[in-house]
């Protein structure tokens, strides 16, 4: 793998880990919810940390690899234990108690599981950051366990691991560490297919190291894989017979089978050291492609004789799919023969029928290979014709038993030599004498040569996937995951946009609701005003009607004396009822019209008065502000002026004529010691003078007034600023604040000292507040101050401030 590929791999691992950490922080960060391993985000986070710590582990681990190989040879460990795991490095930094804790877990039986349990325990206890600092601290120890191109050896990227672990401290993890699933792919009692599959993998690894051609390697792997895959761990038919070397060994094996049914040992064929101990040699001449197997005790049984056995119906009546054939062999030594040293393996699938099987198979000769397919037998003539035999695999154990394998599919590398298989280096290597004899297995099918994949059972398809297919499936799955993540991001962006749009719509709806509520309130107030006005009109109408009726009654009583005649008789003027009603209606109508006209005039007059009042108030406010700008503040300024107009007029008419301004600011001193001086202009009636003060003097005045008048604390005094206090904008803002502060202080003095308010004088003000003492600035003549009348006309806002003299005098604003 090139350097760029290693760099891309490390960057890919870093991005995946960052994404997993981010997803966990988004889901569980800042919440009280517990993050358990049932959540896919937590599982993904653990998997990414494992991938980072697993990346670039060295294959050779010294004592650790040797111990794992010894455990595997002894049957205490599976094949996967020989793969390097990050637990070998992690346990170097753990203390005795921590190691004892992880080794005492009940359901953790492998180093892979212990490493995963340590990672999850560190997440639970928020100690992963500390462990990662310990793991990355010793670079020499890291180089012992990891390659130079590994992730943890990359200082730039590995330094981010403790930071990411620290970011997970806000999450409450509750991950189960004593879980048997952490051991990886669980392996129960090995079956025949498991054993043959491991031997096939060993042969494959040896063939890859040999110098044979690619075609020979491919055919050997395919042939072995087909046999190993098609072996089912549990057979539905009766168990096939097993031939023993002798009767005593056969009986001994039967007893051991009944006692130890489930004990199996997994032996690997790829370690040369183990094969030296066993003494078995598999060797083949380079030109002939013959295979021979010889045991160290030279007591193997020659069992392969020449025969042709077609696949016929077995003991259960099932039809075999393929047939097997072997070269013609004899036991008398006339022809070359194959020796097969077969070590026994306890078959857990042979159960109730084994007594009958051993009894029927003790006196027969058995043949294991066939070279060409033959016609099926019509009847069961003998046991060798009842069952179809596959090539016998050599499995080492304590007893010598041949184990038959029923062939479902086969492959023949007859045209290419089989690679040399050396499982030992001792002096007992033997070569078959006949170079022309070839070990060949031909593929055949009952039909027209259907492919091998069509004959495989569906349950064995996942086992037949090669590394390239698994890699392709993984790449496809990762591509699909990236597509889903991209789609998820786009959907999330759309969701965020819709949420923002929805929030804007909700805000707009709330604004409209407030506007509608305000309009309803105004309309309700109008309705109430109109209702009150209507009630007033009703009352006025009743009064007018009452007045009209009273006038009518008075008119009738005035006409009554004229109705008496001279002779003393009463004569009543006759008047029609209709005329009376019409007259009343017309009078009511006239009165109503008059009332309506009067009411309209009143409303119009009221509106005109209201508009005039608003205009006058605006004018008064403007003139008051201009007065403040020209003559200084009125007592209390606008905010402190009484709402009662009469009281305000009283205050204005009786206030003391004391005005204060800060018209300008000057910069004095040199560059290093430059400071600003504020010109303060005070006028009491016709007496006026200027003083020049720095900000520190204003600040000391403020502290003294706070002690004397606690109410001064509420006044807005500009704070001190150490950096940027020479800025023109800042100085102008401070000038306005100091001017308002002095005016507020002057109003407070007028309120608190009635004598000064009654007779304001310059001497009295200086006695009360020495801050206002008139000190002539250096370099100015004492009598250079002109009269106030000559300078006062310059008090206009239109006069630009930049045209003033460097030393402004009395009234110079």
Curated annotation (Swiss-Prot):
List all Acidic residues biased stretches.
346-357
* Single GO molecular function: phosphatidylinositol binding
Q: Where is this region: Disordered?
A: 269-299, 346-378, 778-813
Coiled-coil residue windows: 466-545
Family the UniProt entry places it in: Belongs to the sorting nexin family.
Sites of Phosphothreonine modification? 641
User: What Gene3D superfamilies does the database record attribute to this sequence?
Assistant: 1.20.58.900, Phox-like domain
Q: Which residues form the PX domain?
A: 656-779
Q: Which residues form the RUN domain?
A: 36-180
Entry keywords, A to Z:
Coiled coil, Phosphoprotein
Point out residues bearing the modification Phosphoserine.
268, 291-292, 330, 344, 445, 450, 639, 642, 646
What protein am I looking at?
Sorting nexin-29
Q: Which organism is it from?
A: Homo sapiens
């Amino acid at each position: 793998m090139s350097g760029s590929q290693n760099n891309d791999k490390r960057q890919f691992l870093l991005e995946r880990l960052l994404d997993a950490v981010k997803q966990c922080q988004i889901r569980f960060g800042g919440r009280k919810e517990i993050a358990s391993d049932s959540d896919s985000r937590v599982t993904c986070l653990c998997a990414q940390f494992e991938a980072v710590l697993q990346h670039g582990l060295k294959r050779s681990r010294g004592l650790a690899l040797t111990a794992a190989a010894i455990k595997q040879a002894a049957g205490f460990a599976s094949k996967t234990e020989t793969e390097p795991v990050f637990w070998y490095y992690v346990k170097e930094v753990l203390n005795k108690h921590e190691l004892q804790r992880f080794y005492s877990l009940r359901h953790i039986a492998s180093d892979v599981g212990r490493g995963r349990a340590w990672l999850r325990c560190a997440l639970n206890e928020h100690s992963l950051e500390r462990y990662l600092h310990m793991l990355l601290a010793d670079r020499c120890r890291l180089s012992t366990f990891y390659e130079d191109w590994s992730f943890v050896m990359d200082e730039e990227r590995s330094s981010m691991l403790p930071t990411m672990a620290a970011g997970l401290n806000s999450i409450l993890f509750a991950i189960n560490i004593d879980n048997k699933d952490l051991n990886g792919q669980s392996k129960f009692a090995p079956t025949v297919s498991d054993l043959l599959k491991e031997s096939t993998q060993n042969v494959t690894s040896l063939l890859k190291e040999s110098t044979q051609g690619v075609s020979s390697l491919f055919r050997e792997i395919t042939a072995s894989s087909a046999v190993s895959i098609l072996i089912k761990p549990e057979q539905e038919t009766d168990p096939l017979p097993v031939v023993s070397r002798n009767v005593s060994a056969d009986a001994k094996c039967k007893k051991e089978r009944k006692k130890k049914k489930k004990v199996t040992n997994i032996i690997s064929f790829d370690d040369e050291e183990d094969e030296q101990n066993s003494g078995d040699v598999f060797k083949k001449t380079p030109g002939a492609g013959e295979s021979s197997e010889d045991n160290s005790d030279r007591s193997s049984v020659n069992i392969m004789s020449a025969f042709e056995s077609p696949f016929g119906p077995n003991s259960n009546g099932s039809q075999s799919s393929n047939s097997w054939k072997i070269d013609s062999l004899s036991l008398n030594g006339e022809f070359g023969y194959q020796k097969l040293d077969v070590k026994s393996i306890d078959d857990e699938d042979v159960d109730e029928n084994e007594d009958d099987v051993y009894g029927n198979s003790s006196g027969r000769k058995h043949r294991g290979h066939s070279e060409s397919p033959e016609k099926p037998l019509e009847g069961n003539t003998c046991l060798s014709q009842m069952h179809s035999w596959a090539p016998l695999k050599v499995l080492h154990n304590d007893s010598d038993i041949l184990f038959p394998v029923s062939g479902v599919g086969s492959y023949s590398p007859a045209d290419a030599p089989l690679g040399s298989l050396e499982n030992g280096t001792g002096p007992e290597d033997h070569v078959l004498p006949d170079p022309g004899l070839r070990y060949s297995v031909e593929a055949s099918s009952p039909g027209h040569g259907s492919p091998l994949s069509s004959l495989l059972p569906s349950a064995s398809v996942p086992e037949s996937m090669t590394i390239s297919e698994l890699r392709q499936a993984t790449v496809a799955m990762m591509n699909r995951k990236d597509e889903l993540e991209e789609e998820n991001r786009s959907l999330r962006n759309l969701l965020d946009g819709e949420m923002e749009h929805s929030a804007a719509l909700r805000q707009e709806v709330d604004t409209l609701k407030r506007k509608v509520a305000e309009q309803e309130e105004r309309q309700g107030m109008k309705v109430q005003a109109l209702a009150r006005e209507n009630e007033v009109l009703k009352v006025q109408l009743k009064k007018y009607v009452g007045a009209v009726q009273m006038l009518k009654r008075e008119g009738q009583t005035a006409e009554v004396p004229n109705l008496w005649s001279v002779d003393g008789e009463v004569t009543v003027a006759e008047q029609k009822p209709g005329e009376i009603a019409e007259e009343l209606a017309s009078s009511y109508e006239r009165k109503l019209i008059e009332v309506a006209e009067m009411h309209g005039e009143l409303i119009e007059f009221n509106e005109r008065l209201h508009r005039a009042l608003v205009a006058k108030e605006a004018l008064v406010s403007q003139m008051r502000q201009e007065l403040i700008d020209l003559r200084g503040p009125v007592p209390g300024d606008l905010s402190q002026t009484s709402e009662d107009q009469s009281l305000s007029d009283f205050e204005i008419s009786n206030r003391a004529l004391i005005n204060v301004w800060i018209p300008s600011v000057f910069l004095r001193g040199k560059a290093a010691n430059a400071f600003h001086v504020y010109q303060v202009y005070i006028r009491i009636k016709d007496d006026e003078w200027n003083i020049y003060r720095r900000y520190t003097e204003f600040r000391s005045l403020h502290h003294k007034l706070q002690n004397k008048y606690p109410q001064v604390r509420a006044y807005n005094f500009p704070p001190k600023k150490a950096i940027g206090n020479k800025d023109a904008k800042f100085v102008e803002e401070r000038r306005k604040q100091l001017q308002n502060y002095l005016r507020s202080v002057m109003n407070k003095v007028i309120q608190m000292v009635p004598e000064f308010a009654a007779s304001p004088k310059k001497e009295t003000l200086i006695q009360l507040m020495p801050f206002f003492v008139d000190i002539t600035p250096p370099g100015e003549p004492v009598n250079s101050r002109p009269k106030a009348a000559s300078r006062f006309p310059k008090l206009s806002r239109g006069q630009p401030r930049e045209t003033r003299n460097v030393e402004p005098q009395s009234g110079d604003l």
